[in-house]
Amino acid sequence: MKAIIVLLMVVTSNADRICTGITSSNSPHVVKTATQGEVNVTGVIPLTTTPTKSHFANLKGTKTRGKLCPNCLNCTDLDVALARPKCMGTIPSAKASILHEVKPVTSGCFPIMHDRTKIRQLPNLLRGYENIKLSTRNVINAERAPGGPYIIGTSGSCPNVTNGNGFFATMAWAVPKDNKTATNPLTVEVPYICTKGEDQITVWGFHSDNAIQMVKLYGDSKPQKFTSSANGVTTHYVSQIGGFPNQTEDGGLPQSGRIVVDYMVQKPGKTGTIVYQRGVLLPQKVWCASGRSKVIKGSLPLIGEADCLHEKYGGLNKSKPYYTGEHAKAIGNCPIWVKTPLKLANGTKYRPPAKLLKERGFFGAIAGFLEGGWEGMIAGWHGYTSHGAHGVAVAADLKSTQEAINKITKNLNSLSELEVKNLQRLSGAMDELHNEILELDEKVDDLRADTISSQIELAVLLSNEGIINSEDEHLLALERKLKKMLGPSAVDIGNGCFETKHKCNQTCLDRIAAGTFNAGEFSLPTFDSLNITAASLNDDGLDNHTILLYYSTAASSLAVTLMIAIFIVYMVSRDNVSCSICL
């Protein structure tokens, strides 16, 4: 009997366990799926980040425009857009621009009534073009315009480069020279003079003052009427007579009068018209602008470079496809805003160790990824583990791993394509704006962002569902492959594990991973079949009757012993016999 017990122990100690699985981290992760809700998985790829505020920067790979004219000192962007005498410099080309002035006004030049027109949008309009250039010649001869002759007015509050009286180069202040009388509406045509098919931005306006000054300058104290028309857009104005504060809004020299400034955009070959009375500011030099430059609200100076410029966070370097936090407009290679953090599954469903101990025993629980990962392998790799007297061996199955990587890469690419499409959708409306400020309405933009966020979240849920199902399929395929290779040399004990009838060290496991495994190379003597061999009995003085007597005596004794044991167990179960054991 002792020999049989020893034999059973040897068989047990030589049995190794081989399991299929996926390497993972030491703790489960949670992902959301479309139909299963939250699922614990062995690995994840974070898709979102939460940025922190930083300074604005130059956009990588593009020229970024801060001020319209960096070399124009002490000039606002509106000064540059109106061509104030001391603010006429070169505007560099740029594919991205920073709207850095909250309330653009002129500095120390003739006071403008900003609220009467869309003049504040003029610098923003110019920022929206990649190339901007002021014409070298005037669009009309102001001195000989209808209602003239005129003298061109200047102002001491708008000094030129020699500190003499001056005025904006984009407009001519037409003051009647001799005929200072009231006039009926007059019309002047504004030709297209740009030479390279650019948009022509024509600036014009009118001056108004108190009644005394109106009579002195123009011979008429009544409100004057003005109209501009270009590309089917017509605008009407009536001047205000008097009532202006002495101190100007711009902080310049005290003025009793004000000017109203507007602009019109003329497409190639299109003529504009201006209908006017007294006090008109006739157009002179025009802006010729082409190309597109994306505009975003920000601040100066621009420090360093960044992948993305975000109105709330400044310069960002893109590390993830999506971000959470505060939503706002952004330009460049930017992550897309989503409401909640997103994770993409990178593994199978996680099974806790406690469950495995119950189902597979101690050795089964510690084998494979299910206990928290394999040492020495890259997270997410498919393969096999072997546990036995040799310790733990690990081997990767390259084909299965590559298939899983391809599946996850495909899902990431799909999400990336969705990201690009949504970015194009967001920026498309901005690119189409030509005559308006290049800003999307906040409410419309937020609504669109919410919709896109929901679409992305759904796409991630569906991707997680597909990845988890695909990973499970890969593991099942790996398990079937292992079972086929092991054949009768192993017993399937469930959950992707097999108990082998031979040792399986690192060499054995590498053969399995390579598909060249041969059980015969690693097998020990087995006890799968009962071998019966003939035996010869030698005559040692015992005859056949004596031998039969010994056997019958032993058999009878064994039978009696078993009957007594059965009787005692039966009586104990009926409570007819009590048994006490004392040491």
Curated annotation (Swiss-Prot):
Gene3D superfamilies in the record: 3.90.20.10, 3.90.209.20, Hemagglutinin Chain A, Domain 2
Q: How is it modified after translation?
A: Palmitoylated.
Q: Which residues are glycosylated?
A: 40, 74, 160, 179, 246, 317, 346, 505, 531, 544
Q: What is this protein called?
A: Hemagglutinin
> Which Cys-Cys disulphide bridges does the record give?
19-497, 75-87, 109-158, 504-508
Which InterPro entries does the protein's record reference?
Capsid_hemagglutn (IPR008980), Hemagglutn_HA1_a/b_dom_sf (IPR013828), Hemagglutn_influenz_A/B (IPR001364), Hemagglutn_influenz_B (IPR000386)
Question: Which keywords are on file for this protein?
Answer: Disulfide bond, Fusion of virus membrane with host endosomal membrane, Fusion of virus membrane with host membrane, Glycoprotein, Hemagglutinin, Host cell membrane, Host membrane, Host-virus interaction, Lipoprotein, Membrane, Palmitate, Signal, Transmembrane, Transmembrane helix, Viral attachment to host cell, Viral envelope protein, Viral penetration into host cytoplasm, Virion, Virus endocytosis by host, Virus entry into host cell
One CC-aspect GO term: viral envelope
Membrane topology per the entry is: Single-pass type I membrane protein
Q: Which residues lie on this side of the membrane: Cytoplasmic?
A: 573-583
Give the free-text miscellaneous remark of the entry: Major glycoprotein, comprises over 80% of the envelope proteins present in virus particle.
According to UniProt, where does the site described as Cleavage lie? 360-361
Q: Where in the cell is it found?
A: Virion membrane; Host apical cell membrane
